[in-house]
Amino acid sequence: MPAIAIIGAQWGDEGKGKATDLLGTSVDYVVKFNGGNNAGHTVVITDASGHTEKYALHLLPSGILTPGCTPVIGNGVVVDLAVLFEELDALEQRGVDVSRLRISANAHVIADYNRTLDKVTERFLGSRRIGTTGRGIGPTYADKMNRIGIRVQDIFDEKILTQKVEGVLDLKNQVLTKIYNRRAATVEATVEELLAFADRLRPMVCDTGLLLNQALDRGETVLLEAGQATLLDVDHGTYPFVTSSSATAGGACTGSGIPPRRLEQVIGIVKAYTTRVGEGPFPTELHDDAGEHLRKVGAEFGTTTGRPRRCGWYDAVIARYAARVNGVTDFVLTKLDVLTGLEQVPVCVAYDVGGVRHDEMPVNQTDFHHAVPIYEYLPGWWEDISGARTLADLPANAQAYVKAVEEMSGARISAVGVGPSRDATVAIHDLI
């Protein structure tokens, strides 16, 4: 069986968790391959009696909620161990079996000095800040690239861990004390903080690349879920307003240890409108009642930070870009229900940059900052669509919206989200 990647095709918060969880019933492994606890996803589960449970996850793969599925944290993830066990304990208290979790021995670990540096750097930058979550993600990835990072496997050898922490703090404390006027971090406190997790962590840790490739050899299905999204990818996003990891289909391979030839399907997740958290360009952003409507009805507040998300109309230009960068085979269009009640729904089909039409995303970020959306206006609908389960169940104008977005976005739409619950989905094509 193949490996399948689920990728955010906008600026994040597209509903990847719900899509992953829906597919998780048909797969054997769900893998988080990038990022850390800087992004969150909410999964809503309704049991046979109609009782609804909402789960907010930040670090764990959403497959943790699917019985019989093995959730995996891959080598491309940076792990805050305190957050990891907070999430595991919270799920265990609600009756979720968390013993299935597997974690790569090569994943990097967020230390307290990484969190401190993240926060003080953002404050130091002031108006030039990136808009990070302050959770130490960027500094931990920087340590990884600089070859001074702490990996999960290091926590099981106190001597090696101490040597590594001593080496990294020689550098970090120079920055903390002499540039930011902060207190120096100590080797003893840092080592103690990390060693405290060793016994609980040990049974979960393995060579996850080997684990996943052996699963594929046995004919099992592996689902790779991205944190963040294409437009936040460190290489292909709106740099420098990006995350510090690879959030594209290419990153799915490097962050999991699965070779590219085994990745047969790439599912791009797009909202029926667009949102963004933090700084950076956003051509279709709304600053009026329409934007407030999307934010209120769509409950657009960050799972991780609680920050209000910036809201705007659907941008087919960035969807086409994401389809090209990732090789998207299928789109899942989420939150179509949020558009219910609007008289007309604009869709951005191109940009005007200095009087010149751009049908593709400008490679020059200055041009992208100055891009003015060119809209096509589609008729809205008033009917409640939350009970729709087939395309024919949708009102004619909602069907027309889905078809128009599909034609503009560069890949077929195979499913449409029409509500927050797990089963509130219109199936158009089989995803597996």
Swiss-Prot record:
Chain sites annotated for binding IMP: 13-16, 38-41, 133, 147, 228, 243, 307
Cofactor note: Binds 1 Mg(2+) ion per subunit.
Active site residues of this protein: 13, 41
Sequence intervals crossing the membrane: none
Catalytic reactions on record: IMP + L-aspartate + GTP = N(6)-(1,2-dicarboxyethyl)-AMP + GDP + phosphate + 2 H(+)
SUPFAM superfamilies: P-loop containing nucleoside triphosphate hydrolases
Pfam name, any one: Adenylsucc_synt
Binding site for substrate: 303-309
Subcellular location: Cytoplasm
Family designation: Belongs to the adenylosuccinate synthetase family.
Protein name: Adenylosuccinate synthetase
Organism: Nocardioides sp. (strain ATCC BAA-499 / JS614)
Gene that this sequence comes from: purA
